[in-house]
């Protein structure tokens, strides 16, 4: 990525796609500080529900973040500043675990054949009572990404009538 030289300080731009195609984080090596943007470490977990989001890219970006040499980690939402690498790694682990949790819940739900619409209605990202205009489209994009991966991994298969079932 690019590096901005501001005199006594440099800012390194590190491309971390997943949340969006162009998502980047900004490392200030002299301050051992990284601005994580929308890698926000909340209990909601990674958001990869936009049209240009990618679950696979997000996971690669989280691995990249795990290896950044920093002591201060600044998020865009809710957490703000996390001081100390051990605390950051713990929060990153919890944040990343949400992906696995969603997938495990989906596998359990797919013990009976279900359609994509069934998965959307069940809500694996948002809680069932959350009424947001965009919630169904986010659920659909996230479910499609998980289903595609689980089909490729052999954990889910297509069934009749456009249904999916866990193996």
Where are the regions that the model predicts?
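Generic structural signal for secondary-structure transition and capping sites
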Residues: 3, 70, 114-115
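Conserved hydrophobic "DFG−1" position in protein kinase catalytic cores
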Residues: 6, 26-28, 158, 166
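Flexible, active-site-adjacent loop/turn segments at secondary-structure boundaries
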Residues: 4, 97, 136
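C-terminal regulatory/interaction regions
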Residues: 105-167
